[in-house]
Amino acid sequence: MNIKRITTEADLHEALKIRRGVFIEEQHVSEADEFDEFDTLQEQCQHILVYHENQPVGTGRARIVGHTAKLERICILKPYRKYGLGKIIVSGLEEIMKEKGLTSYKLHGQTQAAGFYQKLGYQISSQEFMEDGIPHVLMTKEISRNIT
């Protein structure tokens, strides 16, 4: 398993295919809600891929919103879940945003995944709300700047 920062249109296409499989086909999110103006290689939105045996099987993105990093679109193809890939994706996105000087993180986590994010240090910061027809909660995390 390895992780890669997306820097090419071909890699971005792979990430979008994974998101289509998970969010649109599996969870029935509309295409209009899933894909947006941040699905590009622009600097303020970073995308990553996680690989299993040289095949892309998971993805996520993080973008800068004010002084906060917002982690989004974190997903893994169904056969590859429960192998620790989600933790790799979240850690990778956090590291990219930390390199940009951000220490405040937030995400809209599906309620059924809140326990996963809590194990990674996120706290539930809202009541449950609906997003794209799926129950979510706002989750936040603050990290320290390790100045060396």
Curated annotation (Swiss-Prot):
<dbReference type="InterPro" id="IPR016181">
    <property type="entry name" value="Acyl_CoA_acyltransferase"/>
</dbReference>
<feature type="domain" description="N-acetyltransferase">
    <location>
        <begin position="1"/>
        <end position="144"/>
    </location>
</feature>
<dbReference type="InterPro" id="IPR000182">
    <property type="entry name" value="GNAT_dom"/>
</dbReference>
<dbReference type="GO" id="GO:0008080">
    <property type="term" value="F:N-acetyltransferase activity"/>
</dbReference>
<dbReference type="InterPro" id="IPR039143">
    <property type="entry name" value="GNPNAT1-like"/>
</dbReference>
<dbReference type="Pfam" id="PF13673">
    <property type="entry name" value="Acetyltransf_10"/>
</dbReference>
<protein>
    <recommendedName>
        <fullName>Uncharacterized protein YyaT</fullName>
    </recommendedName>
</protein>
